Amino acid sequence: MSFTTLYSAIQGDASARALVAPSLNAELSFSELRIAIMDLQRQIASLGIKVGDPVNIAIPNGLEFVVAFYAVSWQRAICGPLNSNYKQSEFEFYIDDLKSKLVIVPEGSVAANTPAVRAAKKLSVAVAELAWCPKSRLVRIVHFEGAKINAPQPLGLPQPDDVMLVLHTSGTTGRPKVVPLTHKNLCRSIHNITTSYRLDPRDTSYVVMPLFHVHGLLCGLLSTLASGGCAVVPPKFSAHSFWKEFIQYGATWYTAVPTIHQILLRTPPPKPLPRIRFIRSCSSPLAPPVLSKLEATFRAPVLEAYAMTEASHQMTTNPLPPLVHKPHSVGKPFGVELKILDQKGNEMPQGKEGEICVRGINVTKGYLNNPAANKSSFTKDRFFRTGDEGKLDKDGYVFITGRIKELVNRGGEKISPAEIDAVLMQHPDVSEAVCFAVPDEKYGQDIQAAINPVAGKTVTPKQLHDYLEQKVAAFKIPKKFYFTDRIPKTATGKVQRRLVCDAFFNHSKAKL
């Protein structure tokens, strides 16, 4: 790895195309991108932002976000990207929790009194509006509101151990944990990603994942620019414009959650198909039938990966051809040490299930202000406990079998919801299936399922029950099925079982 801070992590030739913003009809070379970042860094420094100052970016995907993210990092400040669609109360929580000095928003936000602006004002935090200026080819602070942050500061030069990025884990229960990631963490993750997929200046990524999350940020954007390739960054994913822009800008790959893959499978593909070097899937399990259909439809290898915020995104991935990529598996560890441990910290033999634990330069040193979580989440020799249950096969491929905290304890019998999800999704009339634990008077807990049928198909609880009877033990069959055309997901497309439980079981219970 030739770089240890994001200051040096834009590696393309000066005249090569670095960034495309379709909504602005703008393309920047690497030279122009560096100039724009440095110019915005000067503007941020003039506002008084100094080393260690937290800055929130509440801007949708696009050129302004990219330039702002790098500018904040170059100034040695701490970046806290936020979903621009949050409600005011959500903005208040994250801005206050980070103790932000500045909230960066799109042009027009103050006049529109957007939720981010209202939250910042309530907390007496300064607001800066950004806009792309085509004539100067720079991103400018076009409006500033709030108290003076500090005296103008000199330009910073980031150091490897500077905390650069702070993200909150969505978690399955309780208050979100705060994950600090350093320049060194991020750069090691970038190195792992670029090496595992052999990214180079000939590649162009089409970024469909939000940049306020590590999936889109680390893999889609930062790794592309660090390899000298080009990133195409639309404001959000749109099935209508995906193929048009993918072809127009010469994209060679994309990374997404299974939800987006399935939407693209339902969208008529272009004729002829563009050459796609590979498709990456991450952040949620990809059903093997969907993987097979993706490969057959788009004539490209589909590589499933495994990632977490605490590891600056990627921990394992299936390899590119001609090496084997295995359905059901999230591949091999790449750039990290990985062990399967029991509850006492003993390493499990090959093929036996236990907790997936990882260690590496990309892994955070610990959560902020949370000694209890740090004690329970790291082993004595600093392996991070992912909370995921899994096993290794004889070839060293990782298979995730469930989430430890999500295991259903039905009268002493442990059920993995992920296992039943996978079986249900093999049914020809099931598009999505999410199983979850519910309280039960007799067994303590039982399992129920939310089902999204294939469009135009109808499936009954009895049909699903009969189907599962042939596949799994009787105690694993969900007690009840809920049918819907929309499974609740987080803003990044992840399924959280507690959200599904709230939407179906708790909602139906409240009606009683």
From Swiss-Prot:
The FACS motif is required for catalytic activity and substrate specificity. InterPro entries: AMP-bd_C, AMP-bd_C_sf, AMP-binding_CS, AMP-dep_synth/lig_dom, ANL_N_sf, Pcs60-like. It is an enzyme of class 6 (ligase). This is Oxalate--CoA ligase. It comes from Schizosaccharomyces pombe (strain 972 / ATCC 24843) (Fission yeast). ATP binds at H168, T169, S170, G171, T172, T173, G174, R175, P176, K177, V178, V179. PROSITE patterns: AMP_BINDING. Catalyzes the first step in a degradation pathway of oxalate to CO(2) to protect the cell against the harmful effects of oxalate derived from endogenous processes or an environmental sources. Keywords: ATP-binding, Ligase, Membrane, Nucleotide-binding, Peroxisome, Phosphoprotein.
